[in-house]
Amino acid sequence: MELALQITLIVTSVLVVLLVLLHRAKGGGLSTLFGGGVQSSLSGSTVVEKNLDRLTLFVTGIWLVSIIGVALLIKYR
């Protein structure tokens, strides 16, 4: 059980980082320091962006549950 939670935690951590990096910068913030402040000609969210948002939230939820699971296993070991 502990090994499965740790593997899930590692996989979801990597996925969250990759999914966040795939998001398009929406202006402002630190992305403008690195040239990310350029506006595109297409405004609004596409279906791909909405699905990417949903997938990011889903993977983040799994990540959060695995963090809590590992913490509980450590506490009640």
From Swiss-Prot:
Transmembrane portions of the chain: 3-23, 55-75
Keywords: Cell membrane, Membrane, Protein transport, Translocation, Transmembrane, Transmembrane helix, Transport
Membrane topology: Multi-pass membrane protein
Principal place of residence: membrane
InterPro entries the UniProt entry points to: SecG
GO biological processes: protein secretion
Any one Gene Ontology cellular component term annotated for this protein: plasma membrane
Membership in a protein family: Belongs to the SecG family.
Full protein name: Probable protein-export membrane protein SecG
Gene source species: Mycobacterium bovis (strain ATCC BAA-935 / AF2122/97)
